[in-house]
Amino acid sequence: MKHAFLLAALFGVAAVQANPTIETNGVLSNRDGRTLYTFDKDSTGKSNCSGGCAAAWPAFTVGNASLAGGDFSIVVRDDGTQQWAIQGKPLYFFAGDARPGDINGDNQGGVWHALRSAPKKAARNDSASSSAGYSYSY
């Protein structure tokens, strides 16, 4: 990853960190506070939301020189755009969310879910862990 940052610096491109989200009240959003959603009908690494679906549920697209890492990956949509994914699940916004922090799309049609973080349960282990201590539910 060090080399990617060096290349970005050489070419005058700002690299985006591997975690493109923030957490507010247990819900993950982009850095502008727009809630992120997953779609039950997506396959791992593949978006199945296009056309009218994509108008109501815009993809959380990847900016220039973005670097995936950890639970975050990048999937390529059928139209060629790149979309953020978490644990292989593509991420979306809901067009019906008017303000940062809105979660109006949660459980829409029983197949759209706001991305929530939940503390992992502690496991009995004598060794130290380097985990961030969060899992995601969708």
Positions of PLM-derived features:
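Intrinsically disordered, low-complexity segments enriched in polar/charged small residues
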Residues: 7-8, 121
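Positively charged n-region of N-terminal signal peptides that target proteins for export
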Residues: 1-4
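Compact beta-sheet-dominated domain cores in extracellular/mature segments
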Residues: 17-138
